[in-house]
Amino acid sequence: MKNFFPLVVILLYLSCEKSNDSHDFISAVESELGVTATTSPLGGESVFFESVAYGSAERQQLDILLPAGDASKGVLLFFHGGGFTAGDKSNAYDEFLLETMQTLLDNDIAIVSANYTLLTTTGNEGVLSALEDGETALNYLRSKLNLLEITTGKVVLAGVSAGAGIAQWNGFQTPNNNQVQGVLAIAAQSSYNLYEWENVFPGFSLDALRQLSPNLNALFLQFYNGEPTAQELAEVEYRSFMDASDPPLYVYNIAGDQVVNAQGELDFDVLYHSYRHADYLRLQAINVGQEFSGVFQESPDAFVLRVLE
């Protein structure tokens, strides 16, 4: 019993030291980021920094979720969906992704969720503005890895639908993919050269549909901020960026393949999210020797944890 009291004192001292270190860390991050840590939207003891500016534009803001305890082993940079006309960084904490995000936090992986310029944002230059915002967010995150005590060289880019396109556009080209270990694309499109979709869907003609549907034609022109040139189409054809040196791709699409439904109407869910897009991406990965995975091999969180080992 005589050794019990000194042991208790030592444990209390170490506990206080850890608490002080945690407080100092949070204070330093708050000072650097210009925001105050708040309650995590996922609950628990994770540390949450909301609406951090990664640039000066209206929607260049991101949220940071740091796991409780020790330094993070890596980070997932997430881009929300919404057809480039809607959506928010808070979508990362919705029920659809809740289990995945919680699993990552429980395994000491930080989560960063970014907003980006929409096609409805004043002054946008079409989809390229959103893609380049993804690059800006990634560069900002890389510059803060040491501050946030996140292991360098351990980044996964992820997104749903439109956000998956941002993740792929940045993940498949150098130097954007520096330190990126994987790309997680859910409900993904295979290219933002929309004419490439004629190779995805048999019998699909983009120009024919544009002529038949004024609404679709308006969306097309909004997407590119006007009639695109061949060079502008090439700039967003991220499927052609893929090569063997790129990080592994995880792609998961479940929508069907009937672009025109039984009522003779265009099914935008199929057009944007068909499994054919995933197949077209996997075909390119095979052709160039890029590693790829999907739901039949592993879950999204298992993929992230594997590539960040």
Locate the predicted segments by residue.
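C-terminal catalytic histidine-bearing segment of alpha/beta-hydrolase fold enzymes
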Residues: L249-Q263, D269, H273-E309
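Alpha/beta-hydrolase active-site loop
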Residues: E125-N146
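N-terminal cap/lid segment of alpha/beta-hydrolase-fold proteins
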Residues: F25-D70
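Primarily recognizes the serine-hydrolase "nucleophile elbow" in alpha/beta-hydrolase
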Residues: N139-P202
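Short amphipathic alpha-helix adjacent to the substrate-entry channel of hydrolases
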Residues: S90-V112
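Short beta-strand element of the alpha/beta-hydrolase
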Residues: S72-G83
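C-terminal motif of bacterial Sec signal peptides marking the signal peptidase cleavage site
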Residues: L12-S15
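Mobile cap/lid helix-loop segments that gate and shape the active-site cleft of serine hydrolases
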Residues: P41, L194-F241, P247
